[in-house]
């Protein structure tokens, strides 16, 4: 066998990993998103480009590396950061191939359990084997290792979740790459330590352990939640290799110090904050604010250790897991290989089995109790990594099983290769349409469509992160429509955001200083001691009142000189509360939604005129011709892209397009513009023929027509 692809040699394993890396990187580059995407992409790109501070926990290592990517003079800034994700994911795929190869190099516990005469007889039997047969067996062993490395590497490459984050600006692929690199170093240290002891040497390979410790600290600077969850498994691996003695030795202190040295990457946060960058989330200059930011204080409310939450999340996890290798049906082969791999892992090396069992248990214990709307599948990546590692063991088991049949050796090898190739091909085919973002202009088009009907100098209020995050990129990085005053009302509940507004819209903030200053004073007090406001109804009422007054003033002061717009999500809340109050006149708006106290009076003060994808406030009730812009809808509903049912496009973006078309039609219908109303309803039905509000509204048009 050519030593370049011989899994028994160092260069052979490196060549296999390199092949996986090349395939992975090529796949990700061909399916790379050409611009900004939804969720956190826009904010992360803006923070990286300006060396700012991203949302908690700040992910300093990612921001620094992504910033370096933005300096590459190829493509737009978003493409460069998207490519960084692709590079990290490709390296992760290569790392998992090396990890599987490393674990298969460690002698099986079944082999190492042979003692005394059994061991001697085994040696004599081995010496008496026919050289040709020995050569065949050696070749088969090398082939199974090659197959295991390739299968695990390629299945991780094409797995749905990793691939989905490999084509956009997100932190998770870097996190996976570092996690697998730590695992690789630790298992190599374990093997070399065992070999050292067997030879009777006294020079254990602690450099690998220390390197893993330093890398662990660095990895904490990306997505520390999932990294921390690997600690029980890593501690178990150390114990199984060194025993309790390690935890009493200076080596533990050295490893801990190196991990802390890696953690020093977090010094970036206060240093960056002191520069007052454009994106300075949390403004972590002081130790107190730094601690709030790193610990993700604002997200801790998403944790709910209840059986109901776990039951719902478990169903969601099962769906994610079933789709990893191509979809509910296509995944059966990959999942079967995973199960077989875990069984083989248990038989071959129980330490490896329990290591990954601990990774899975720790991850599920937290992820099943963390209820967030987006990126939920990313929190299960440690489980999916473990599944992919198991497929490598499963591939080895499958080949050995086929080789033991009565098939001729050549035919058996061909059958094994074909079976494994089929598993990889099905995973690729099943996940390609879900993860091909080479024509993903949805977020960029969304922002363009929103801007298209906002007049120069207009103000836009939104509660929708899918609007605001990509808008940060388009406005602050690409410098488009800098005249638009875009405000995320959710972020008005964070004091750091006012620094951003003061820098970006100084005239607007100066004009509203009288209402902003009192609220900001209360807000900073609330941030220090939210419990005090919860317990004290007077304080709670005061901060709510000041928040409402500030928003009403922002709108009333702006509308004197320029138009003001709001996004559809605000009207959805308004309609929801209005319906409750229609049934119960004594109902308090704030009791049904935290934004009710300002949404209801604001929307009651003005007439709402649908303009494209937004509503414009009007101070009178006269009819205003609603804008009918030529909306960019590339990939939205033309069949060129496929979205999961829980995808943000289906859940939040598409409903805005459809809903605003219907709102325009209803507005026109209310003012006797029958033909125009019909056109608006039909536009919605062209995108989604089953959209019930459009169908119902279209049915009602003749009844609303003048008689």
Stretch-by-stretch model annotation:
Residues 83-135, 181-185, 339-340, 389-393:
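Transmembrane-helix motifs of polytopic, lipid-linked glycan transferases
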Residues 32-44, 54-65, 278-283, 438-443:
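Extracytoplasmic catalytic/substrate-binding loops of multi-pass membrane glycan-assembly enzymes
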Residues 48-76, 86-87:
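Short hydrophobic/aromatic helix or loop-helix immediately within or flanking a transmembrane segment
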Residues 66-70, 81-104, 108, 155, ...:
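Transmembrane alpha-helices of multi-pass, membrane-embedded glycan-processing enzymes
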Residues 14-27, 150-154, 258-260, 358-359:
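Alpha-helical transmembrane segments
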Residues 29-30, 75-82, 116-120, 136-142, ...:
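Aromatic- and kink-enriched transmembrane "portal" helix at the membrane-lumen/periplasm boundary
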Residues 1-12, 103-144, 193-207, 244-246, ...:
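Membrane-interfacial, low-structure loops and terminal tails that flank and connect transmembrane helices
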Residues 101, 168-169, 173-176, 181, ...:
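ER/secretory pathway lumenal C-terminal domains and tails of membrane proteins involved
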């Amino acid at each position: 066998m050519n030593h370049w692809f011989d899994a028994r040699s160092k260069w052979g394993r490196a060549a296999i990993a390199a092949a996986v890396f090349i395939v992975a990187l090529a796949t990700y580059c061909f399916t790379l998103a050409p611009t900004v995407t939804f969720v956190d992409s826009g904010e992360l790109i803006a923070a990286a480009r300006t060396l700012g501070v991203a949302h908690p926990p700040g992910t300093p290592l990612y921001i620094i590396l992504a910033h370096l990517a933005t300096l590459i003079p190829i493509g737009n800034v978003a493409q460069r950061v998207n490519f960084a994700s692709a590079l990290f994911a490709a390296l992760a795929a290569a790392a998992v191939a090396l990890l599987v190869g490393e674990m298969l190099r460690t002698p099986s516990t079944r082999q190492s359990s042979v003692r005394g005469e059994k061991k001697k007889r085994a040696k004599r039997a081995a010496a008496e084997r026919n050289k040709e047969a020995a050569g065949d067996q050696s070749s088969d062993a090398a082939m199974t290792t090659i197959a295991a490395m390739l299968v695990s590497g390629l299945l991780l490459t094409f797995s749905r979740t990793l691939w989905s984050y490999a084509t956009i600006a997100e932190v998770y692929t870097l996190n996976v790459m570092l996690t697998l690199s730590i695992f690789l170093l630790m298992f190599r240290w374990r093997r070399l330590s065992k070999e050292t002891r067997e030879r009777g040497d006294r020079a254990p390979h602690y450099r690998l352990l220390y390197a893993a410790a330093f890398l662990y600290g660095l990895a904490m600077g990306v997505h520390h939640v999932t990294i921390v969850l690997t600690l029980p498994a890593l501690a178990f691996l150390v114990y199984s290799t060194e025993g309790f003695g390690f935890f009493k030795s200076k080596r533990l202190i050295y490893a801990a110090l190196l991990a802390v040295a890696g953690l020093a990457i977090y010094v970036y946060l206060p240093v960056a904050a002191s520069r007052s960058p454009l994106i300075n989330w949390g403004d972590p200059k002081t130790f107190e604010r730094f601690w709030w930011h790193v610990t993700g204080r604002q997200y801790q409310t998403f944790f709910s250790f209840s059986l109901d939450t776990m039951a719902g999340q478990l169903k969601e996890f099962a769906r994610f897991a079933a789709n990893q290798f191509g979809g509910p049906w296509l995944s059966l082969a990959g999942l079967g290989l995973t199960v077989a791999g875990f069984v083989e892992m248990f038989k071959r090396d129980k330490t490896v089995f329990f290591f990954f069992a601990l990774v899975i248990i720790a991850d599920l214990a937290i992820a099943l109790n963390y209820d967030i709307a987006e990126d939920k599948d990313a929190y299960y990546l440690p489980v999916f990594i473990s599944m992919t590692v198991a497929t490598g063991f499963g591939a080895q088991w499958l080949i050995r099983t086929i080789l033991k049949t009565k098939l001729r050796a050549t035919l058996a090898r061909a059958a094994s290769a074909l079976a494994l190739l089929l598993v990889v091909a099905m995973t690729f085919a099943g996940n390609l349409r879900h993860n091909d973002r080479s024509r993903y202009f949805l977020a960029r088009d969304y922002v363009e469509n929103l801007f298209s009907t906002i007049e120069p100098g207009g103000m836009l209020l939104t509660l929708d992160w899918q609007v605001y995050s990509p808008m940060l990129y388009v406005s602050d990085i690409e410098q488009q429509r800098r005249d638009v005053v875009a405000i995320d009302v959710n972020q008005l509940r964070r004091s750091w955001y006012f620094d951003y507004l003061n820098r970006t819209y100084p005239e607007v903030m100066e004009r509203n200083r009288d209402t902003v200053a009192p609220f900001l004073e209360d807000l900073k007090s609330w941030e220090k001691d939210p419990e005090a406001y919860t317990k004290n109804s007077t304080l709670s009422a005061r901060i709510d009142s000041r928040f409402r007054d500030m928003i009403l003033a922002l709108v009333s002061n702006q509308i004197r000189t320029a138009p003001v717009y709001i996004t559809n999500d605000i009207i959805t809340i308004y309609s929801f509360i209005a319906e409750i109050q229609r049934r119960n006149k004594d109902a308090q708006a704030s009791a049904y939604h935290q934004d009710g106290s300002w949404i209801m009076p604001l929307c009651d003060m003005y007439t709402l005129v649908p303009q494209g994808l937004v509503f414009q406030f009007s101070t009178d009730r006269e009819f205003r011709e609603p804008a009918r812009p030529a909306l960019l809808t590339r990939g939205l509903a033309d069949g060129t892209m496929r979205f999961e049912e829980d995808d943000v496009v289906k859940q939040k973006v598409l409903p805005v397009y459809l809903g605003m078309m219907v709102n325009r039609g209803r507005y026109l219908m209310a003012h006797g513009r029958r033909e125009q109303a019909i056109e608006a309803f039909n536009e919605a039905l062209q995108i989604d023929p089953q959209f019930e509000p459009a169908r119902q509204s279209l049915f009602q048009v003749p009844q609303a027509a003048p008689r």
